[in-house]
Amino acid sequence: MCTKKNKDYRNTDTCPVLTDVALKKSALEGKIRKDHKRAKIMYNYVHDKRAAYFKAFSEIYNSKCAYCGVLIGIIDIRMFEVDHFVCEDVFSNDTTGRSEAGKVNNLVLSCYSCNRGKGKLVIDGQYKKTLNPDDNAIAKVFMRDDNYYIKIQSVYAGDHIIADFYERLLLGSEFRRLDYLLLEINNLIQRLHDPITAQKLEQCFGKLVVKRNKTLI
């Protein structure tokens, strides 16, 4: 069950946890700058799914949306995007501003649903720390209840900014429960030693993924 207050709602019990995200992102930015001496806006290099940098960036997040936890494979990689955690509109509309907005430490792996829902929501002040997905602070704001819905922790129940974030990203939606089930099935398949059972689960997984994605088109 996923009801413990220290449990990361984005993970099942067998999911790898996010670790050293800031260090890994810094290392990736260093590699980009080494490969491209005149690079200014890191977003331009990281967001291209055809480039190796996107793969490296997504692996920092264990190939999962940093906000809801959906896995690449449950939804197509083409439905994943690189989000500006602090939206671009907060920064000046010039090269300096775009460079600041596009620094790797302000970029987050996000599914299409979360990124488009978040939109131009301004995250500032204390909320840059409270909702930070990189250091797992966000996992203290939301939780899974007994029915695997994502809920706001009681301590933040009256917080309008948190509620707005929750509603915009549709974190309480039914399909977030299905994504969690699919994550559980995927992890179980990886652990199974019986190929026949694994094959049956893979077939079930595939059918659920198709149904899930058709429903949301």
Q: Can you say where each PLM-predicted feature lies in the sequence?
A:
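Short, charged surface segments at domain edges that flank catalytic/cofactor-binding sites
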Residues: 2, 17-67, 91-101
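Histidine-centered nuclease catalytic patch
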Residues: 70-109, 118-125, 129-136
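Hydrophobic N-terminal alpha-helices or hydrophobic patches in metabolic proteins across all domains
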Residues: 61, 71-80, 115-117, 187-190, ...
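Helix-loop elements that line ligand-binding/catalytic pockets
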Residues: 127-182
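Beta-strand-connecting loop/turn residues
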Residues: 63, 78, 83, 147-148
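C-terminal, charged low-complexity interaction regions
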Residues: 158-217
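Short cysteine-rich clusters marking metal-coordination/redox-active sites
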Residues: 65-68, 111-114
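Extended, low-complexity, charged intrinsically disordered regions
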Residues: 1-14
